[in-house]
């Protein structure tokens, strides 16, 4: 539940995070109606939170946040598995964090802490700790690891911090600022995303002054991302592709130096229900038809059924 301030008489809006793409513009307009939902400012007072999978988020209650920060955080946590959520919850309490921007920073390091909720299986504790510290290892190496010895070395060698989620061993991590409080950092790419772009103002190479957008997205979300980077129009913007589900034939047909972000978005919206074989077919059609821009490719995608294709 978000409000403009902590005044009990202030109007409130109930917002689901991450915000469903189809509801994004409606949500922002509703927040604007209660004088919150700004592009950069932390002007949303978190009056209440209901969350079953991540109770640590309740620490946000009573703080001010930006709506896109909360949306980003909700999306990031959506990608966490059960143990990663446990790590995040425990790390929030271990480091005493409560602000949305702090939690965004923590989301990049929470996977580096070891959390022990049950000390009865030292073998399992040791192997999980080893994976946490090393990120990954050869299955044979893990099988041959003495998990009990590794667990005992952890328990005797590090101070443990007791939280309601278990004992946290922080493995000496240092919390670093991944988020500069204005430009939202890159995030995992969900299956619904067709293309991920990095946006920055033309002629500006400052790595801190850039935004990542995932297409398709609502037009308002794209416009807000542009404003955070200081871009007033597509003509002032440089786009770099960081990931794409389109085949090479489509990507090579697009001139990202001249293409419109909004035309690219319309193309991705048109292809949002495509299966893998549809993308392959679109690539073959583009190879034959030689389109020169996103609008041309969108027209081909709209009429894909009119083409015969034998893969």
Enumerate the language-model features and the residues they cover.
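Mixed-charge (acidic/basic) macromolecular-recognition segments
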Residues: 27-144, 148-152, 166-192, 208, ...
């Amino acid at each position: 539940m978000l409000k403009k301030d902590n005044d009990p008489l202030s109007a409130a809006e109930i917002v689901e995070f991450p915000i469903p793409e189809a509801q994004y513009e409606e949500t922002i307009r509703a927040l604007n109606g209660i004088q919150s939902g700004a592009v950069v400012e932390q002007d949303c007072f978190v009056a209440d939170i209901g969350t079953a999978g991540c109770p640590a988020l309740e620490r946000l209650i009573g703080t001010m946040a930006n709506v896109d920060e909360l949306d980003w955080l909700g999306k990031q946590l959506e990608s966490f598995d059960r143990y990663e959520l446990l790590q995040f919850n425990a790390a929030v309490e271990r480091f005493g964090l409560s602000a949305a921007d702090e939690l965004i920073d923590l989301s990049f390091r929470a996977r580096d802490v070891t959390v022990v909720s049950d000390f009865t299986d030292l073998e399992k504790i040791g192997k999980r700790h080893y994976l946490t510290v090393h990120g990954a290892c050869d299955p044979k190496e893990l099988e041959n690891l003495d998990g009990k010895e590794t667990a005992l070395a952890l328990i005797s060698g590090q101070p443990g911090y007791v939280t309601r989620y278990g004992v946290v061993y922080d493995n000496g991590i240092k919390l670093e600022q991944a988020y500069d409080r204005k430009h939202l950092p890159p995030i995992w790419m969900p299956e619904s995303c067709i293309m991920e772009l990095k946006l920055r103002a033309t002629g500006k190479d400052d790595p801190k002054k850039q935004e990542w957008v995932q297409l398709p997205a609502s037009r308002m979300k794209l416009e807000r991302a542009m404003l955070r980077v200081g871009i007033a129009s597509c003509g002032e913007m440089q786009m770099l592709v960081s990931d794409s589900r389109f085949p090479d034939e489509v990507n090579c047909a697009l001139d990202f130096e001249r293409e419109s972000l909004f035309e690219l978005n319309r193309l991705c919206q048109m292809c949002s229900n495509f299966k893998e074989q549809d993308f392959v077919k679109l690539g073959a059609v583009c190879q034959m038809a030689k389109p020169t821009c996103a609008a041309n490719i969108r027209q081909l995608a709209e009429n894909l059924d009119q083409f015969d294709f034998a893969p």
